[in-house]
Amino acid sequence: MSFNHYYQSELTALRQLGRRFAERSPALAPFLGQAGRDPDVERLLEGFAFLTGRLRQKLDDELPELSHSLMHLLWPNYMRPLPAFSILQFDPLKRSGPALQVERDTPVESVPIDDVRCRFRTCYPTEVLPLDLTALTYSVKGDGSLLSLRLEMSCDGHIGELDLSRLRLHLAGERYISQMLYLSLLRNLEGIELIPLDAAGKPLNGANGTPMAFRMPGDRVQPVGFAEEEALIPYPLNTFRGYRYLQEYFAFQDKFLFVDLNGLDLLKSLPEDTLKQMRGLELRFDIRKSGIQRLRPTLDNVKLYCTPIVNLFKHDALPIRLDGKQDEYLLLPAEYDLENCGVFSVEGVTGWKPGGLGYQEYVPFESFEHDPSFDVPQSRPHYSIRQRTSLLHDGLDTYLSFGIRHTEAHETLSIELICTNQNLPRRLKLGDICMACEETPEFLSFRNITPATSSFAPPLSRDFLWKLISNMSLNYLSLANVDALKVILETYDLPRYYDQHAEKVSKRLLGGLKSIKHQHVDRLHRGLPLRGLRTELTIDPEGYIGEGDLFVFASVLNEFFALYASLNSYHELRVKSTQGEVYQWTPRMGLQPLL
């Protein structure tokens, strides 16, 4: 509940209930019921309402000293705001040669908004090639379809110079089409045909005079977005990765609409003379069953050289003078207004002693490195973090407090932060994230092809943290019925706490979950018996945009359940649609598929 509610409640009580009390007991409160317009008296009443409102809020805050400390110790990522996300696309290289590797966490900037540049960083490592996607054709073939992508060199040179082994595709544009393409490429793909092209765009002929073509199996297309190095936001290593998949799905589903086409290194087996003649490539995806025959994908639906980006950047806070006169100190990012810059995490605190006496590193209280009873070499100064819902903007205010210690030296603290621009990126348009930084590779041009999402702070004023704490003891018995699964999924859907449209979409999505069953199964793996668990989930597709929407959601649930498996056991998921479709994934032991 917001502080405004407490303040208005106390002010109303003073002015309305106070008048009624004076009418009933005039001898006890002769002045409480008198109307007055003295501004000094009004100021006193408002100040009193402000103080008592804070007191009531403190009584109702559900022990943040316990829940916040526990979360900072175990899952500090859920105490951090959810920053803005978008998709960035790099333009093809203008020089021939191997791919240019754009590493994860490469910084980029937007054009200025109110003299503030929003700063982002990339989430996926991206290989940028001098290949351009110039044409996409889609044709119906019986019950199936054929998707053809034509790639051509964007500069002088030939395919043999590229050292091509993998190509990443982002399925973009209209959500229904992109999700159906995701389903088609990962579930209904019969095979892939690779056709080398000459400078005129015609198929190259082999030694026998017939056009060359290479056939690849459909399993060469693999999903993207589930690896540790493909996380949208930093997660501690001790947290359960399955919850990250859920949080990322509800916050930015576009993150999962990527696929990798592997096996392109087979081109290296061609004679050198043939490679020098190759100026392009045609990829034909034979889809055995298609649900998008009436909708035609275009070049807007398949993109190359894309990566999700997140609005996170390193920054310093204004220095703090540790004089012992305050219980806690508000962190203020330097050079920014609070509305345009919020604290995501505290990366380091350094205390500088006056008189050139050196410096000392402060450690988080939850690390226990400050306590001699935990076998640390020496006691070190420590700090604690506390977040509160801000009264001035939509984000959180972050405070630091320090242990009781000698403060006569009046240290000056420098604090390293990771920050966000809060909701300022919402004002960016398509193409506005196009400015390079110091660490951005040279000769690359880029732009955002989707609007930036909203930023959401964790709803600390509700029972959100206690729901998270209750999830620490979850197991498969906790997921014995579909209502329990829905509660877990709701917990990690942060946008639903703030956005009414997101809440409606979430209710529609979770309303499609009809039943869940678990069954213990045994199988032989490499000659050894192995115990596992099979989960059968029944979903009504009426609550989804289409079959592709259901499949993307089920794919995320498959990764979630696979990581939920007990030690030395495996998990397999089977999803049944009430309209008859059945999806089954390869049994998994954690991250390892059982083949």
Region locations from a protein language model:
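Short, low-complexity Pro/Thr/Gly
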Residues: 156-168, 172-373
